[in-house]
Amino acid sequence: MTAQSAQPLYIGGRPVDATSGETFTVTNPYDGSLLATIGQASQADVDSAVQAAQRGQREWAAMTGMERSRILLRAVALLRERNDELAELETRNTGKPISETASVDIVTGADALEYYAGLAPAIEGSQIPLRDTRLVYTRREPLGVIGAIGAWNYPIQIACWKAAPALAAGNAIVFKPSEVTPLTALKLAEIFTEAGLPDGVFNVVQGDGRVGAMLTEHEGIAKVSFTGEVGTGKKVMAAAGGSTLKDVTMELGGKSPLIVFADADLDRAADAAMMANFYSSGQICTNGTRVFVERSAKEAFEAKLVERVARIKAGDPMDPSVNFGPLVSFEHQEKVLSYIALGKEQGARVLAGGDAWNSGEWAKGAWAAPTVFTDCTDEMRVVKEEIFGPVMSVLAFDDEEEVIRRANNTKYGLAAGVFSESLNRAHRVIHQLEAGICWINTWGESPSEMPVGGYKESGIGRENGVETLNHYTQTKSVQIEMGPFESVF
């Protein structure tokens, strides 16, 4: 793939050159090649995008739910039609294997749009009778313009997840993708326009954290939806509340426990632990990186992990047979490799991997070997801190009460999972785990019907599921009096 020319922003239904005079580059993490030069948005560009969104939102909100649904479904059809083209672009930008992006990233983004397209005509209020001559009815009205800030690990999926409920409810969006993986956002904007979305209803402003700050502080933004790390999320929330008391939805980090009891199907649990740590090279917020294994099953479970790690096929992400790609950037590679070194320093035993993969044929890419640490303790930094890479920590436990206490001993609360053939125990344990997304005898799938979000410092609000529509509407109450009006004057 040859380097693309400087890419514009997308404002008011068309490409628009950034006015800041600044640009940034986007590279392929597999070989370091240049993919694109992108224009950095200025404050004037953000203002223009918000104004375009305000104009477009009025037209969009005036449509019926059925009319909005038809347009969203046309966008779904275009996404599915262009799945392979978009998957290739996503793979070259993120480094994720084409086997993943072609089967998950665009598919699940389109699924979310299709799901909320079906719900758009069903958004309704309620009627509350007070007496024969008096009643109250409610309307669920859109918030207005949503500022959406995406993460770099699932660029187009996250854009769709944020757009779907917001658009279904009649809002407009100004979307800022991560500056690390910004390429598919512009394609999505073009698809929305082609599908018939009114000009200005979906805008894209490119750039670094400065652009995100412009959105969170903008008086024309009614709500901010952010996906990213906890530290940035706190800054976003402070800015959103400090400017105009904006509503916020946040999907933040995690250090999720995956608990394997001795009675579990160990092959199934080992398969899940592999997916929960090495899919997308470990760059998934819900990953089960703290793998607690009942002591009597630990040795057998570890043997199954070693066998499975040996079967991983790393290589060119465009090769359909490859199932493990590089990390998203060379900067992120440095972070992950530093944690692998730290794990060794703090006494964790390397069960598999532990290599830098930065020499020979691997030197040109942002690689880190899939790594399994064992004999870990809860105090180790590789156990406590989010690494966001292919690093699994295995910890032994002796009883149910102990593992629940240790699993909950974290500032995070995004996800959790239990593997046991006793469904009574599995449900009992899950109900005591402090996490918003939980799985029993499986891991990782987040269908559009399932609310996604975290407890504690892992987030606020939810994405996906019916209840998320409530986060993109506001309730107006109307009281009607059909009898005489009584005044004390």
Swiss-Prot record:
PROSITE patterns found in the cross-reference section: ALDEHYDE_DEHYDR_CYS, ALDEHYDE_DEHYDR_GLU
Pathway stated in the Swiss-Prot or TrEMBL entry: Amine and polyamine biosynthesis; betaine biosynthesis via choline pathway; betaine from betaine aldehyde: step 1/1
Enzyme active site: 162, 251, 285, 463
UniProt entry tagged with the keyword NADP: yes
Keywords: Metal-binding, NAD, NADP, Oxidation, Oxidoreductase, Potassium
Record-stated family: Belongs to the aldehyde dehydrogenase family.
Highest rank taxon of the organism: Bacteria
Cofactor section: K(+)
SUPFAM superfamilies: ALDH-like
Binding, K(+) 1: 93, 180
Protein name, UniProt field: Betaine aldehyde dehydrogenase
Binding positions for NAD(+) per the UniProt entry: 150-152, 176-179, 229-232, 253, 285, 386
GO molecular function: betaine-aldehyde dehydrogenase (NAD+) activity; metal ion binding
Enzyme Commission number(s) of this protein: 1.2.1.8
Task of the protein: Involved in the biosynthesis of the osmoprotectant glycine betaine. Catalyzes the irreversible oxidation of betaine aldehyde to the corresponding acid.
Family matches, as Pfam families: Aldedh
HAMAP family: BADH
Cofactor-binding details, from the entry: Binds 2 potassium ions per subunit.
Residues annotated with Cysteine sulfenic acid (-SOH) modification: 285
Residues involved in K(+) 2 binding: 245, 456, 459
Gene behind this protein: betB
Gene3D superfamilies with a match to the protein in the record: Aldehyde Dehydrogenase, Chain A, domain 1, Aldehyde Dehydrogenase, Chain A, domain 2
Reactions accelerated catalytically: betaine aldehyde + NAD(+) + H2O = glycine betaine + NADH + 2 H(+)
Key word Metal-binding present: yes
GO biological process: glycine betaine biosynthetic process from choline
Species the sequence originates in: Chromohalobacter salexigens (strain ATCC BAA-138 / DSM 3043 / CIP 106854 / NCIMB 13768 / 1H11)
